[in-house]
């Protein structure tokens, strides 16, 4: 009896089913994740810089020279922006 001649198995043209991503896809995913992380770090830096620079900033629109007045009424009566030619007894002050 003769022994049958064995043929090598045919080569598969399909990619390995265990390999889900190629090197190019991994590089693209890594670049996107790095870009998102960089943007988040930059936004965090800008927010902290803004908060640090504007810490405790409080602007008022009070009249000049009113800090030396004895009371709020005296300061408002001496304020030139509130002065008019009318009678001072009928003025109303909104504080």
UniProtKB/Swiss-Prot annotation:
<feature type="modified residue" description="Phosphoserine">
    <location>
        <position position="89"/>
    </location>
</feature>
<dbReference type="InterPro" id="IPR003585">
    <property type="entry name" value="Neurexin-like"/>
</dbReference>
<keyword id="KW-0597">Phosphoprotein</keyword>
<comment type="similarity">
    <text>Belongs to the glycophorin-C family.</text>
</comment>
<dbReference type="GO" id="GO:0005886">
    <property type="term" value="C:plasma membrane"/>
</dbReference>
<feature type="modified residue" description="Phosphoserine">
    <location>
        <position position="78"/>
    </location>
</feature>
<keyword id="KW-1003">Cell membrane</keyword>
<protein>
    <recommendedName>
        <fullName>Glycophorin-C</fullName>
    </recommendedName>
</protein>
<dbReference type="InterPro" id="IPR042192">
    <property type="entry name" value="Glycophorin-C"/>
</dbReference>
<keyword id="KW-0812">Transmembrane</keyword>
<feature type="modified residue" description="Phosphoserine">
    <location>
        <position position="71"/>
    </location>
</feature>
<keyword id="KW-1133">Transmembrane helix</keyword>
<dbReference type="GO" id="GO:0016020">
    <property type="term" value="C:membrane"/>
</dbReference>
<feature type="topological domain" description="Extracellular">
    <location>
        <begin position="1"/>
        <end position="25"/>
    </location>
</feature>
<feature type="topological domain" description="Cytoplasmic">
    <location>
        <begin position="47"/>
        <end position="95"/>
    </location>
</feature>
<keyword id="KW-0472">Membrane</keyword>
<dbReference type="GO" id="GO:0030863">
    <property type="term" value="C:cortical cytoskeleton"/>
</dbReference>
<feature type="transmembrane region" description="Helical; Signal-anchor for type III membrane protein">
    <location>
        <begin position="26"/>
        <end position="46"/>
    </location>
</feature>
